[in-house]
Each structure stands twice: as structure tokens, then as C-alpha cells.
Amino acid sequence: MFTSTGPFTAAHPVILASGSPRRRAFFEQMGIPFEVILPVDAEPSPIEGEQPEVYVRRAAEAKARAVAADHKGRLVVAADTVVALDDMILGKPASADDALSMLRRLAGRTHVVASGCCVVLPEGGRETFHSITRVTMWDCPEEALAAYVATGEPSDKAGAYGIQGIGAFLVRSIEGSWTNVVGLPVAELTALLLRRGAIHCQLPVEAVHA
């Protein structure tokens, strides 16, 4: 009998240092018990010329350290995701006009989505990694971009689109992890948590005693 709907569980709830509903959904789907504790003013700004993968690692580490400092002996997971075109980081749009401007720049081009993830272990160790996905968009007409912006979906998305939602119609192809584009490199994170014994597989009783 499963005690959750996902394939994994943990002895103690993981602290997810993120308010992202997409990241919460991944944890729920995997069955990993967690609680959300948000870092306060911990996200740094990009440094001019900083590579996307360097920035997301630095940002994820800052978030994880901020939460772990007040929760010693707990496992903390933090992540940060950015979209970058020609090595220029595109954050969340400041307005509808800003969202449309970003989408115009991305249309017909290949850009990079970089996610950094930092795991602070209960004993105090820390592991940080990043994942890179290349996303190619088709040359979508202006009126379709404007119609997409009008849905409101781009407002809280890095790069002004959500591949898991309405914005899927903008994407011609991807090279790399799909979950990374959504906001969390799930395969890499699961492998790390299993390797460190932070989570374990939730097997039916008959499988355990077979």
C-alpha cells in the first residue's frame, strides 16, 4: 500500500526554498514530503557579463544558505532559472510591454534556459549543480505574441513564456531537459537525493517482501 501518490518518500520533510508553483508540483508528483520556506531578500542580481549558468548557481546557493541558516539539521533545496539570449539574461517581465519585447527577441531564435539547484544537507554539506536546455522558437507573428501576452501567462515567467502552459505553441524544439525549462532539473535532483540517502523509493509491501 502506497502512503503517497508518488514513487519516492523521505523520513523528514524537505524544505523547498521556492515559491514557484511549478517546483511545488514536481515535488508533489514525485511524492516527496516537503514544506515551503521562502528566503528573505536572498536572490542576488546578475553581474554584468556573468554567464547564465554561473549566475543561477550563485543565486540558488544564496537562497539555500539563507533558509538553511535558520533551519539547522534540515535538508534544503533551492533553485533558480533564467532565460538567456546571446548570453544576456532575461528575467521576469516588468510589464506587458516588456513581455512582448522579450518575446519579439526570442521569436525565430534559439535561446538557453539555465537552472541552478543547491541542496544543503542535514549534516551541513552542500551540493550545487546546473542544467542547460536549448530552446528554439518559431518566428511567431506579432499578433500571436500580443494575444499570448494578453492571456497574462507571461507575467511571472522568466523570458515571458511558459512551456508547460499556453506558451507551448511558441516552441519549435528543445535540446535537453524539459523539466529544466519549467524550472527544476528533476532527473538530476532526484539522482542527487537518492545518492545522498535523502529520499528512498516507496515500494508496495509485496515488493519489499518478495
From Swiss-Prot:
This is dTTP/UTP pyrophosphatase. Its EC number is 3.6.1.9. Nucleoside triphosphate pyrophosphatase that hydrolyzes dTTP and UTP. May have a dual role in cell division arrest and in preventing the incorporation of modified nucleotides into cellular nucleic acids. InterPro entries: ITPase-like_fam, Maf-like. It catalyses: dTTP + H2O = dTMP + diphosphate + H(+); UTP + H2O = UMP + diphosphate + H(+). The keyword Cytoplasm applies. One of its GO terms (biological process) is nucleotide metabolic process. Coiled coil: none annotated. It is found in: Cytoplasm. The keyword Cytoplasm applies. NCBIfam families: maf (TIGR00172), PRK14362.1 (NF010942). It comes from the Bacteria. Belongs to the Maf family. YhdE subfamily. Its cofactor is a divalent metal cation. The active site is at D80 (proton acceptor). GO terms for cellular component: cytoplasm. GO terms for molecular function: dTTP diphosphatase activity; UTP diphosphatase activity. It comes from Nitratidesulfovibrio vulgaris (strain ATCC 29579 / DSM 644 / CCUG 34227 / NCIMB 8303 / VKM B-1760 / Hildenborough) (Desulfovibrio vulgaris).
